Amino acid sequence: NWGYDPKNYNVPEGSYSTDPYHGEVRVNEMKQMIKTLHENGIRVNMDVVYNHTYHLADSWFQKTVPDYYYRKNGDHYSDGSGCGNETASERAMMRKYIVDSVVYWATEYHIDGFRFDLMGVHDLDTMKAVRKALDQVNPDIMVYGEGWTGGESALPAAQQATKNNIYRLDRVGAFSDDIRDGIKGSVFDFLDKGFVSGKDNMEENIKFSVVAATPHSQVTLTKAGDKCTNWSGQPGQSINYISCHDNLTFWDKLAISNADDSEADRVKMNKLGSAVLFTSQGVPFMQAGEEMLRSKPNEKSETGFDENSYSSPDATNSIKWDNKGNVMDVYEYYKGLIAFRKAHSALRMTTAAAIQNNLTFMTGLDANVVAYTIQGEVQGETAQNIAVIYNGNPDAVTVNLPAGTWDICVNGKKAGCRSLGTAEGSVTVEGISALVLVQGDDTVNKVPAEDA
């Protein structure tokens, strides 16, 4: 099991230690692990599951004060977690327990961020208290979570820390299922396609995701989809992702929804999806192994893939490192996109106002094409302007560019901070690919023509 059966919230899982039967070994080895990761420039976020407990009758909460720590509907226990029970975060001592627990992990283990499982089961005031307490430890600690519940909760909807209420919180983020489903199709319909896999009329959904679910005058919500509302108050509240440990991997989803397409075309779709992810405003999140076309095979499944592998063996859940050598172009593409994003602060604007003032969508484009420019008037930005184009069509399109000469840093094959060539007036964007260009950036390194 993935570890969503919490018993003692403040104790490290023993199965990862060399000696789980001695508590000090668990503690010391986890601290050593985090220290080593920090020494290598890697921050550590922890998935926390305060929304339910593994057992109810035998839990320490229930034994301490029966029924106080759990929500009920009449004589029945509410099950907003989908796991048999849900904790009552709105009650003073449950709220205090959650706040004390995250502060303990932050101070004792130096955890850098907390990802709240089924955050919608928790009330808004508790999440505000979590943010306030962690700010006193370190304001840079991340707080984000799943902005939904796992079932019907007894907590009134207006009090739930769901995605649609996230604007009422400060510096607390939520996963964007809008960009997830917009890129690849619904996770609940294996055959449903998205922008990169051939679904028409997804342009507005992608534009909505590009601005991190914040208000923008050029985004028409009625065309973006039923779920799309400006739920994000600031771009940092939108956790953008295509796949995570839940549901099908990105590659497996494409294998099912686009089974009739060639593997080469599905690789293009994967690259285009990653380009949308890493050039959108907000916080990019990726599943480990996505850069190597991670798959979760399951011969017993009707599709051949595992979409809910919480209890599946290593044969399914392990990262197939041997496959990296077969898909180095995809791996290097992800590396290049990450490097480009890190190099350009205009892709990481911190306020909705900055996005509104600096990001302009191009008009008069072909169907299934999204394009926009960003003015370089963002603190730390080295380019005067950035242009981003996504082509969801199987065929090439031509897009007119603003005046001047542009350096191409990302195309359908390569990505990074080096110029792959220049364009002026207009540019051709290959089918199922992205093109990212910069203007007036002296930091761009030129790539020899034969290497472009």
What are these regions (language model features)?
Residues 233-403:
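Loop/helix patches that line or flank the sugar-binding groove of alpha-linked glycan CAZymes
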Residues 1-109, 122-138, 142:
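Substrate-binding/active-site clefts of carbohydrate-active enzymes
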Residues 420-451:
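C-terminal beta-strand-rich structural cap/linker in extracellular carbohydrate-active enzymes
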Residues 9, 37, 105, 116, ...:
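Conserved, mostly hydrophobic/aromatic
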Residues 403-415:
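Solvent-exposed beta-hairpin/edge-strand motifs
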Residues 131-132, 137-293, 297-299, 379-381, ...:
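Conserved alpha/beta catalytic core and glycan-binding cleft of carbohydrate-active enzymes
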Residues 1, 48-57, 118-123, 146-151, ...:
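Short, solvent-exposed turn/loop segments enriched in Gly/Ser/Thr/Pro and often Arg
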